[in-house]
Amino acid sequence: MSGIALSRLAQERKAWRKDHPFGFVAVPTKNPDGTMNLMNWECAIPGKKGTPWEGGLFKLRMLFKDDYPSSPPKCKFEPPLFHPNVYPSGTVCLSILEEDKDWRPAITIKQILLGIQELLNEPNIQDPAQAEAYTIYCQNRVEYEKRVRAQAKKFAPS
């Protein structure tokens, strides 16, 4: 494992614990031996107030490669969400998460999670990743928002 990646992720964890947006979660997972795995984080993004996503808490896994922060983490909703920019596998399609697009090593975990929260309610229809959600979003916004509200209710924190 890269010392650069681990040191950056340790800084990220410290900064997150000191200050993070209300309702968001970002925690490194534990290895079988109980030690912390900084390369694999369990996160959760709350649906934004005043949107059909409100009330939901959407679980996301963030996986970092050894060359982080040169390369972005892979962000994957578990379980996958109904959304035009979420692949059926759950992987998020967002330009700041793509090395050859808008990724920059200075982007923080907090910025990534806030960017994904923004994307939930403002899909990028130029870059669809899920045919069904994309089609319904474009053709029947009322039905799309109904499905999103049902999903938010399903993923409401207990």
UniProtKB/Swiss-Prot annotation:
<keyword id="KW-0539">Nucleus</keyword>
<keyword id="KW-0963">Cytoplasm</keyword>
<dbReference type="GO" id="GO:0106068">
    <property type="term" value="C:SUMO ligase complex"/>
</dbReference>
<comment type="subunit">
    <text>Forms a complex with SENP6 and UBE2I in response to UV irradiation. Forms a tight complex with RANGAP1 and RANBP2. Identified in a complex with SUMO2 and UBE2I, where one ZNF451 interacts with one UBE2I and two SUMO2 chains, one bound to the UBE2I active site and the other to another region of the same UBE2I molecule. Interacts with SETX. Interacts with HIPK1 and HIPK2. Interacts with PPM1J. Interacts with RASD2. Interacts with TCF3. Interacts with NR2C1; the interaction promotes its sumoylation. Interacts with SIAH1. Interacts with PARP.</text>
</comment>
<dbReference type="GO" id="GO:0007084">
    <property type="term" value="P:mitotic nuclear membrane reassembly"/>
</dbReference>
<dbReference type="GO" id="GO:1990234">
    <property type="term" value="C:transferase complex"/>
</dbReference>
<dbReference type="InterPro" id="IPR016135">
    <property type="entry name" value="UBQ-conjugating_enzyme/RWD"/>
</dbReference>
<dbReference type="GO" id="GO:0045892">
    <property type="term" value="P:negative regulation of DNA-templated transcription"/>
</dbReference>
<keyword id="KW-0007">Acetylation</keyword>
<dbReference type="GO" id="GO:0003723">
    <property type="term" value="F:RNA binding"/>
</dbReference>
<dbReference type="GO" id="GO:0006511">
    <property type="term" value="P:ubiquitin-dependent protein catabolic process"/>
</dbReference>
<dbReference type="GO" id="GO:0005643">
    <property type="term" value="C:nuclear pore"/>
</dbReference>
<dbReference type="GO" id="GO:0051301">
    <property type="term" value="P:cell division"/>
</dbReference>
<comment type="pathway">
    <text>Protein modification; protein sumoylation.</text>
</comment>
<feature type="cross-link" description="Glycyl lysine isopeptide (Lys-Gly) (interchain with G-Cter in ubiquitin); alternate">
    <location>
        <position position="18"/>
    </location>
</feature>
<comment type="similarity">
    <text>Belongs to the ubiquitin-conjugating enzyme family.</text>
</comment>
<keyword id="KW-0833">Ubl conjugation pathway</keyword>
<comment type="subunit">
    <text>(Microbial infection) Interacts with human herpesvirus 6 IE2.</text>
</comment>
<feature type="modified residue" description="Phosphoserine; by CDK1">
    <location>
        <position position="71"/>
    </location>
</feature>
<keyword id="KW-0132">Cell division</keyword>
<dbReference type="GO" id="GO:0001221">
    <property type="term" value="F:transcription coregulator binding"/>
</dbReference>
<dbReference type="GO" id="GO:0043398">
    <property type="term" value="F:HLH domain binding"/>
</dbReference>
<keyword id="KW-0832">Ubl conjugation</keyword>
<keyword id="KW-0067">ATP-binding</keyword>
<dbReference type="GO" id="GO:0007059">
    <property type="term" value="P:chromosome segregation"/>
</dbReference>
<dbReference type="GO" id="GO:0048471">
    <property type="term" value="C:perinuclear region of cytoplasm"/>
</dbReference>
<dbReference type="GO" id="GO:0005634">
    <property type="term" value="C:nucleus"/>
</dbReference>
<keyword id="KW-0808">Transferase</keyword>
<feature type="site" description="Substrate binding">
    <location>
        <begin position="100"/>
        <end position="101"/>
    </location>
</feature>
<dbReference type="InterPro" id="IPR023313">
    <property type="entry name" value="UBQ-conjugating_AS"/>
</dbReference>
<dbReference type="GO" id="GO:0044388">
    <property type="term" value="F:small protein activating enzyme binding"/>
</dbReference>
<dbReference type="GO" id="GO:0030335">
    <property type="term" value="P:positive regulation of cell migration"/>
</dbReference>
<feature type="modified residue" description="N-acetylserine">
    <location>
        <position position="2"/>
    </location>
</feature>
<feature type="site" description="Interaction with RANBP2">
    <location>
        <position position="25"/>
    </location>
</feature>
<dbReference type="GO" id="GO:0043123">
    <property type="term" value="P:positive regulation of canonical NF-kappaB signal transduction"/>
</dbReference>
<dbReference type="Pfam" id="PF00179">
    <property type="entry name" value="UQ_con"/>
</dbReference>
<dbReference type="GO" id="GO:0099524">
    <property type="term" value="C:postsynaptic cytosol"/>
</dbReference>
<dbReference type="GO" id="GO:0099523">
    <property type="term" value="C:presynaptic cytosol"/>
</dbReference>
<dbReference type="InterPro" id="IPR000608">
    <property type="entry name" value="UBQ-conjugat_E2_core"/>
</dbReference>
<feature type="site" description="Interaction with RANBP2">
    <location>
        <position position="4"/>
    </location>
</feature>
<dbReference type="GO" id="GO:0005829">
    <property type="term" value="C:cytosol"/>
</dbReference>
<feature type="active site" description="Glycyl thioester intermediate">
    <location>
        <position position="93"/>
    </location>
</feature>
